[in-house]
Design a protein with these regions (language model features):
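Hydrophobic h-region of N-terminal signal peptides that target proteins for export
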Residues: 9-17
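Active-site nucleophile loop of the alpha/beta-hydrolase fold
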Residues: 104, 168-176, 194-196
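Short substrate-entry loop that stabilizes the transition state in hydrolases
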Residues: 62-68, 73-108, 176-177, 199-201
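Alpha/beta-hydrolase active-site loop
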Residues: 114-135
Length: 282
């Protein structure tokens, strides 16, 4: 069993305080929520230990009568977890949810050809285990969003774990090397792709060391897996198109939003309004 460092760092850039010192945490049954960076210790395949930061972003004042939903957010390749703080800070400040922002090893998520050789499913499992020590978290309302390589990680977690009720893979789709499994549990998916994306083309194909599925085919595979309606409702949003596969197992839903002039760097501050509205339904 990998050890989780009990030491928490104050997230200085946000000017917040961690009222629990490491010594106090060692003797307590649970930790109080506050904005901080925790450190997760993980062993690589070569038995080298690495220490990986995870930002926990909370409102300034915790309502102790409330159990907060949890949103994991995954950066793209070459990015870092700090990028999500500003994107989602209005939601975390207002207490809509608690933000959990892990850091990819070597600034990437290990889907095969990436620089990272870390077991990132294990890493997320370790984070979830650590979060069980905190008060006021609702593990029945846990969601994940990711962009680009982080989107691929979100898909992988949905395929291989049952942590999340809904996911939002942004600017990527399923890849051939990570097929859906018999053990994959029903989950709601909001997939968003830009038709003008040249980094991960909407039509799929070989790119960045992966073979990407066509974006529509990717959504259709989720829908088929969960026995959704195979005739999606098609909603025109100006020039953009939303495909809704409903009537899925366990009252789940698959949505695919095609943004016609969207490139790889989609406007997250705008998109997340719809993502959060989608998450809240599950």
């Amino acid at each position: 069993m990998k050890n989780i460092l009990l030491k928490s760092l104050i997230f200085l850039s946000l000017g917040s305080c961690d009222e629990n010192s490491p010594n106090n945490n060692l003797n307590s049954n649970s930790y109080s929520l506050s904005t901080k960076t925790i450190l997760i210790e993980q062993s690589l395949d070569n038995n080298n230990l690495i220490i990986r930061p995870v930002i926990i972003q909370t409102p300034n004042v915790i309502d102790t009568s409330k159990s907060y939903p949890i949103v994991f957010a995954f950066h793209g390749r070459g990015g870092n977890n700090n990028s999500w703080v500003n994107h989602l800070i209005n939601y975390t400040n207002s207490g809509e949810f608690i933000g959990i922002y892990p850091q990819g090893y070597l600034e990437s998520w290990n889907l095969g050809p990436e620089p990272s050789n870390a077991n990132d499913v294990e890493f997320i499992n370790l984070i979830v285990d650590e979060l069980q020590n905190y008060d006021n978290l609702n593990f029945d309302k846990m969601y994940a969003i990711g962009t680009s390589n982080g989107s691929g990680m979100v898909n992988k977690l949905a395929i291989e774990t049952n942590h999340f009720k809904a996911i939002a893979p942004i600017a990527s789709q399923l890849i051939e090397s990570l097929p859906l499994l018999d053990s994959t549990n029903p989950i709601s998916v909001l997939q968003v792709n830009g038709a003008a994306d040249t980094t991960i083309p909407i039509d799929g194909g070989p790119m960045l060391g992966h073979v990407f599925l066509d974006a529509y085919e990717s959504a259709e595979l989720w829908a088929t897996k969960f026995n959704c309606s195979q005739n999606p409702n098609i909603i025109m949003l100006g020039q953009d198109t939303l495909y809704v596969f409903d009537s899925c197992e366990n009252e789940k839903e698959i949505r695919y939003l095609r943004i016609e002039d969207g490139e790889h760097n989609l406007p997250l501050h705008i998109l997340f309004q719809d993502v959060w509205a989608f998450f809240q339904r599950f």
